Amino acid sequence: MLFLDKGRIEALRRRLIEWYRVYGDKDLPWRNTADPWAILVAAFLLRKTTARQVVRVYEEFLRRYPNPKALASAREDEVRELIRPLGIEHQRAKHLIELAKHIEARYGGRIPCSKEKLKELPGVGDYIASEVLLAACGSPEPLLDRNMIRILERVLGVKSAKKRPHTDPKMWSTARRIVPKDPDMAKEFNYGMLDLARKICTARKPLCTECPLNDICIYYNND
């Protein structure tokens, strides 16, 4: 098991949450709901587009299709037209309707709070399953994507031997140890990770002098 400095982890948690409360994108509607269907819809709409683009169609989408049953019986051309501003609307509409039909047929329209069962849904992998568990089921799951991985690598020196670190079970295990156990704090921590990586700890030319983690960051202090 990888050794992680407890003091550094505590500082990482505290500062990320404090930073998120001031600078994070707390107004995003899917961050203010515990409805698993709304969270799944957001996850599918957010693929290959930006949060600000999704905001424009998200609430109208949920107004028309407030549950899996409503979307399962929808016409694909109507769904495509609604989400056209996001791009790849043919693929996106097909996958969303397929997801809704599967939830209706398999679970009677109820979305399970089980990672194994969530991952059986079409188009749902570890990350989206974790999103649902975190936001709808009160489970302190990590949202391990390239953004969180970048911060783990830079701040804590956590490295994966795999070419695709987000598929590395060891990275998932490490991330779970870092996420706070309190469900509300776990959400703030994860969202703080995503926002900090997008705004400050960017892949190229990170704004290290503006980062709340710079004095505990291995990357910054070894640069």
Curated annotation (Swiss-Prot):
Regulation: Thymine cleavage is completely inhibited by Ni(2+), Co(2+), Zn(2+), Cu(2+) and Mn(2+). Activity is not affected by Mg(2+) and Ca(2+).
Cofactor(s) needed for function: [4Fe-4S] cluster
pH dependence (UniProt free text): Optimum pH is 8.5.
Cofactor note: Binds 1 [4Fe-4S] cluster. The cluster has a structural role.
Binding positions ([4Fe-4S] cluster): 201, 208, 211, 217
Keyword Cell inner membrane set for record: no
UniProt-listed GO biological process terms: base-excision repair; mismatch repair
Domain of life: Archaea
Catalytic activity field: Hydrolyzes mismatched double-stranded DNA and polynucleotides, releasing free thymine
PANTHER family to which the protein is assigned, alphabetical: ADENINE DNA GLYCOSYLASE (PTHR42944:SF1)
UniProt record similarity statement: Belongs to the Nth/MutY family.
Function in brief: DNA glycosylase that excises thymine from T/G mismatches. Also has a weak DNA glycosylase activity on uracil paired with various bases.
Protein name per Swiss-Prot or TrEMBL: Thymine-DNA glycosylase
Species, as recorded: Aeropyrum pernix (strain ATCC 700893 / DSM 11879 / JCM 9820 / NBRC 100138 / K1)
